[in-house]
Amino acid sequence: MPLCGHRFAMTTTSKALRRAPALAAALLALHGASSVATAQAEATVLVQRAATAMGGAAALRSLNNVTFEFNAANFGLGQEETPASPARATFQFGRIINDYRGSRRLTTTESRVVTGAVQRQRGVVTPTVGLSEINGVQTASAAAARVNVANDMRAQPERLILAALDNPALLTMVPPKRIRGETMDGVRMGSGAEARTVWFDRLTHLPVAVERVTDDPILGDRRTTTLYTRWEDAGGVKLPREVDVDVNGRLQSHQVVTSASVNATLTESDFAIPDSIAQRAQPIPPAPPAITVMLAEIGPNVWRAEGGSHHSLVIRQGDGLVVVEAPQSTARSKAVLDTLRSRFAGVPVKTLVPTHHHWDHSGGIREYLAQGVAVVVHSRNVEFVRGIGAAPKTVAPDALSRGGRMPTVSAAGNATSIGTGDTRVMLLDLPTVHAEGVLAAYVPSLRILFVSDVLTPGPTLAPAGSREIAAMVRARGIVVDRVVGGHGGIAAWADVERAGSRDQ
């Protein structure tokens, strides 16, 4: 019996030891579930307090529409004089009606840059159709514009708090954060690309800021923070009277609400969209459409990569390719590179030349860097391009963010040449009011000059840009037959000279 008892004790102990990891895992899972439930409960309390501070959940649910008039200063991030310059401002005032019951928005604005003409805009956006009117000219809104408006309406604080109340399982606490000198409590709402973090004032319980992190071709992780202040009553609901938006710490817009009202009787004719516009409405695609790139031959071994609003110049130099301009986005650059691999099998892109730093012309640079392509850029923009490659990229990781080697980024000197012979391309500094640090690409054998933004070849040519290009050509002593645009088409040199001789 003692022996049997000993055997039984040993067997029982062994089984207990074998069960220990499973028991520990179960306890950890239970603790984890309890922690999640606690975080959700704490987050729900913050959201409920915010709803009460704004007038109560019932008042928020009773909002059929909100009308506000405003003035604003909007700053064009990515369109500065240099990468380090302050963003250029556009001043705007207007009125917006968010019709939540009808899922539509009416916008009426007037805006102008400091020295520019007034631009009058009116927009009506519904889930299925949109109208864009600029200085009296009406067009159908793009599908992407309708998506942006719908997302913005959902992101208004009165709608965001309601969505949080209705979806407590999607809430979780985040560590406190200091915002404008005060410690705020944060709640993460949703998951994935739609996730937002809302920060609440500990004294007023009102939402102070909403933060969203998305992927950006220039900034990598783009942290957009919308800050709300000066909350005042509007028909039983508190709404903010000042709204600031900053992107990675840089102010993008400052809006002052001069009046706000709720549940107005709407005039249906204000939202009317002519049949001629409605018939041209494009459905919202389930996924972004594929980008198509076509290679249009300019001359022997020289092509323009076309498709959409932005173009690149491609020069084959023996066993490698030079690409001038990487505009718009990662997707655009991938489409260009895929097209070149298909057309020139075994002939890699060895050098990329961006013309200038403006974001719509540099949004595709990172993809070239990630694929190991060396970059030659104006000396003013070297650090800007290196910054693109070094930007943290956790939302959409790439080869660089995973530890890949950064290719060389070098400065173009005075009339730097890439290659020799008939495919040699010269990089020329182009003085212009458009920006500092602009390059033009000149292929001497074909007498073509590739430029972006300074001049857009089309039915008419801008006199100012034509004069700037003509002055540079004369100063360099080069001969040009055609100007190839990064936008638009191709202009004969005689037309450029003629346009440059006209008054504005």
Describe the role of every protein-language-model region.
Residues Q40-T52, A117-Q119, V124-R196, R202-T204, ...:
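Flexible, processing/modification-adjacent segments and terminal tails
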Residues H254-G318, T416:
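Zn-dependent metallo-beta-lactamase
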Residues C4-A24:
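Bacterial N-terminal signal peptides that target proteins for export
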Residues V45-T52, G56-Q138, T172-P175, T330:
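N-terminal mature ectodomain segment of secretory-pathway/periplasmic proteins
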Residues A470-Q504:
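Divalent-metal (often Zn2+) His-rich catalytic cores of metallo-beta-lactamase-fold enzymes
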Residues V114, R180-I273, Y442-P444, V451-S452, ...:
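Gly/Pro-enriched, hydrophobic low-complexity segments
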Residues A331-V376, R476-D481:
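Active-site metal-binding motif and surrounding structural segment of the metallo-beta-lactamase
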Residues A296-S342, V438-T456:
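Conserved beta-strand hairpin/beta-sheet module of binuclear metal-dependent hydrolase folds
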